[in-house]
Amino acid sequence: MGQKIHPTGFRLAVSRNWASRWYANNNNFAAMLQEDIGVREYLKKKLKNASVGRVVIERPAKNARITIFSSRPGVVIGKKGEDIELLKTELQRRMGVPVHVNIEEIRKPETDAQLIADSITQQLERRIMFRRAMKRAMQNAMRLGAQGIKIMSAGRLNGIEIARTEWYREGRVPLHTLRADIDYATSEAKTTYGIIGVKVWVYKGDTLGRNDAPVVEEVTEDKRPRRNARPGDRRPRRDGEGGAPGARRGGPRRGAGKPEDGKTGE
């Protein structure tokens, strides 16, 4: 049975960038990757009410730069910046290097896949009907500029005994078009019946990725004369003669010269 490839991993280095941007040798790679996973889990739990979409981690020389994308940056910063300072201190303790924290605002949270998935899971935990939550999220996304959206929920929906999967789609969601900007996210709702998984795909239009448009080189026509001319070539030759094969060349015909004096041709 066919399976869906991860849309973000499928488009890395084509139209998407990595969420962890650093280089490490073989000895340190696993430890640094595990550190990034722990930092993201901590931020997700700590900033649960701040509507965090994604976290980008960069590691310039013996430092760390963490960019938090949130639709509610005021909740992350706190009163007079108190919360952000406490957050920075905890991150420095976890990572062991100086940490710089940047906050980026998400302008349209209704079209961000991670925020849509988190919103649906929160509604499922409050016992709201899953169909109502999914359709409301799709309507808001299409109203604010998304060209297509697909939402899938799986688990004991509405508390039924047998788990099932249901999905809804509106608009276009071209998963195998590399230039398509597909925002993908997952989330889990922890209900009294068990865990319900939610997946969201949002199609935001086509992009060439990092604004690197392909450069088309101009092909100039080669005007140098060809060495071996074809038999039917009508270009003039060096001796001034030319024409197609079989055509009469210039010059007088044989026997068509001037008659000698006193003689007439019969």
Swiss-Prot record:
<feature type="compositionally biased region" description="Basic and acidic residues">
    <location>
        <begin position="230"/>
        <end position="241"/>
    </location>
</feature>
<keyword id="KW-0689">Ribosomal protein</keyword>
<keyword id="KW-0699">rRNA-binding</keyword>
<dbReference type="InterPro" id="IPR009019">
    <property type="entry name" value="KH_sf_prok-type"/>
</dbReference>
<dbReference type="Pfam" id="PF07650">
    <property type="entry name" value="KH_2"/>
</dbReference>
<feature type="region of interest" description="Disordered">
    <location>
        <begin position="214"/>
        <end position="266"/>
    </location>
</feature>
<feature type="domain" description="KH type-2">
    <location>
        <begin position="39"/>
        <end position="107"/>
    </location>
</feature>
<dbReference type="GO" id="GO:0022627">
    <property type="term" value="C:cytosolic small ribosomal subunit"/>
</dbReference>
<dbReference type="InterPro" id="IPR036419">
    <property type="entry name" value="Ribosomal_S3_C_sf"/>
</dbReference>
<dbReference type="GO" id="GO:0006412">
    <property type="term" value="P:translation"/>
</dbReference>
<dbReference type="InterPro" id="IPR018280">
    <property type="entry name" value="Ribosomal_uS3_CS"/>
</dbReference>
<comment type="subunit">
    <text>Part of the 30S ribosomal subunit. Forms a tight complex with proteins S10 and S14.</text>
</comment>
<comment type="similarity">
    <text>Belongs to the universal ribosomal protein uS3 family.</text>
</comment>
<keyword id="KW-0694">RNA-binding</keyword>
<dbReference type="GO" id="GO:0003735">
    <property type="term" value="F:structural constituent of ribosome"/>
</dbReference>
<dbReference type="InterPro" id="IPR005704">
    <property type="entry name" value="Ribosomal_uS3_bac-typ"/>
</dbReference>
<dbReference type="GO" id="GO:0019843">
    <property type="term" value="F:rRNA binding"/>
</dbReference>
<protein>
    <recommendedName>
        <fullName>Small ribosomal subunit protein uS3</fullName>
    </recommendedName>
</protein>
<dbReference type="InterPro" id="IPR001351">
    <property type="entry name" value="Ribosomal_uS3_C"/>
</dbReference>
<dbReference type="GO" id="GO:0003729">
    <property type="term" value="F:mRNA binding"/>
</dbReference>
<dbReference type="InterPro" id="IPR004044">
    <property type="entry name" value="KH_dom_type_2"/>
</dbReference>
<dbReference type="InterPro" id="IPR004087">
    <property type="entry name" value="KH_dom"/>
</dbReference>
<keyword id="KW-0687">Ribonucleoprotein</keyword>
<comment type="function">
    <text>Binds the lower part of the 30S subunit head. Binds mRNA in the 70S ribosome, positioning it for translation.</text>
</comment>
<dbReference type="Pfam" id="PF00189">
    <property type="entry name" value="Ribosomal_S3_C"/>
</dbReference>
<dbReference type="InterPro" id="IPR015946">
    <property type="entry name" value="KH_dom-like_a/b"/>
</dbReference>
<feature type="compositionally biased region" description="Basic and acidic residues">
    <location>
        <begin position="257"/>
        <end position="266"/>
    </location>
</feature>
